[in-house]
């Protein structure tokens, strides 16, 4: 499979999760936008991705609706794993004409922080850290050399920012600033933009 344009990174530590992505939207060497937000809060979850931007937007909308529907229907909140599995099923349903995207999905519930990686046909893998998109090979080296599950969220945010910056330096389809989403183990959410 060809690398999907963009870089998105997720990191799980004992204190919570951090997801980040750069903002460049490019197709075939042409920069279409420098303001493409690829990290989203969906209910009490975070989602980031690389790939066709319209597919990422559609998946975000679908997940917003499906999570709300589940919670209204059952009268209880959906767990992180169940929400990630729901996304996996949605992706698999479209396997003949897949969403051209790689997704990072995470959140915090009674089982603690969780991070999942999904490919275009719905493979679901739980991991401590992951990078997707065309800048992933660069970013993953930074993460592997410095990741520690015991680091606090501030250090985790610095590490993920360092990894995205490394990708921006070497990947032509990544750039134009960094969106950072942080969720602590109590479910508190913080969103930051870092110009770069």
Curated annotation (Swiss-Prot):
Compartments reported by the entry: Cytoplasm
One biological process term in Gene Ontology: proteasomal protein catabolic process
Subunit structure, as described in the record: The 20S proteasome core is composed of 14 alpha and 14 beta subunits that assemble into four stacked heptameric rings, resulting in a barrel-shaped structure. The two inner rings, each composed of seven catalytic beta subunits, are sandwiched by two outer rings, each composed of seven alpha subunits. The catalytic chamber with the active sites is on the inside of the barrel. Has a gated structure, the ends of the cylinder being occluded by the N-termini of the alpha-subunits. Is capped at one or both ends by the proteasome regulatory ATPase, PAN.
Reaction(s) the record says it catalyses: Cleavage of peptide bonds with very broad specificity
Gene Ontology MF: a single term: threonine-type endopeptidase activity
A cellular component term, taken from the record's GO annotations: cytoplasm
Top-level taxonomic group: Archaea
Catalytic machinery residues: 7
Protein name (record): Proteasome subunit beta 2
Chief localisation class: cytoplasm
Gene that specifies this protein: psmB2
Propeptide: 1-6
Protein role: Component of the proteasome core, a large protease complex with broad specificity involved in protein degradation.
Keyword vocabulary terms for this entry: Autocatalytic cleavage, Cytoplasm, Hydrolase, Protease, Proteasome, Threonine protease, Zymogen
SUPFAM superfamilies per the UniProt record, alphabetical: N-terminal nucleophile aminohydrolases (Ntn hydrolases)
Enzyme class: hydrolase
EC identifiers of the protein: 3.4.25.1
Activity control mechanisms: The formation of the proteasomal ATPase PAN-20S proteasome complex, via the docking of the C-termini of PAN into the intersubunit pockets in the alpha-rings, triggers opening of the gate for substrate entry. Interconversion between the open-gate and close-gate conformations leads to a dynamic regulation of the 20S proteasome proteolysis activity.
Family as reported in the entry's similarity comment: Belongs to the peptidase T1B family.
